[in-house]
Amino acid sequence: MGIAYVDSSALLKLVVSEGETAALEADLATRDGLVTSSIAVVECHRAARRAGDRRILQRTELVLESVYLLGLTAVVLERASTLRPVGIRSLDAIHLASALSVDERDMEVITYDDRMADAARANGLRVQQPGRTARRA
């Protein structure tokens, strides 16, 4: 089914089971590959450490090993600094610029962060939220 760009909100659902986890796992099993920005390493590790559970940290490592990490290049950082909408948060802008750097026509962004999803769509990317039935306000 092509590759998917998965942001930290999606990756963390693979670490700690939530309502969308089963649907997300089923979707990802059909993908040819998964990519994310290397900033996801920091985001996921910080979340795991906040949880204070060694098993969560170990699961975080396993999840991150299953994803190809895109480096933070000068081109990605420059693009992130100029992306619209201007209100997009900095880490989301880096995720978005990283996704836009992938030369894969059929790639979809998987995120459970509605602001990130809106920004991705505004920049021409297709967004999926497996297991999410209704948009949260």
Feature annotation, model-predicted:
Residues 1-36, 49-59, 124-125, 131, ...:
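Short, well-structured N-terminal submotif of metal-dependent ribonuclease cores
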Residues 8, 38-39, 112-113:
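Fold-independent oxyanion-binding glycine-rich loops
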Residues 21, 38-82:
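Active-site-proximal, substrate-binding regions of enzyme catalytic domains
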Residues 11, 44-48, 98-99:
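Buried hydrophobic packing segments
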Residues 1-2, 31-34, 65-68, 103-108:
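Short active-site oxyanion
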Residues 11-12, 41, 116-117:
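A generic structural signal for short hydrophobic patches within well-formed alpha-helices
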Residues 68-118, 123-125:
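Active-site neighborhoods of divalent-metal-dependent phosphate/nucleic-acid chemistry enzymes
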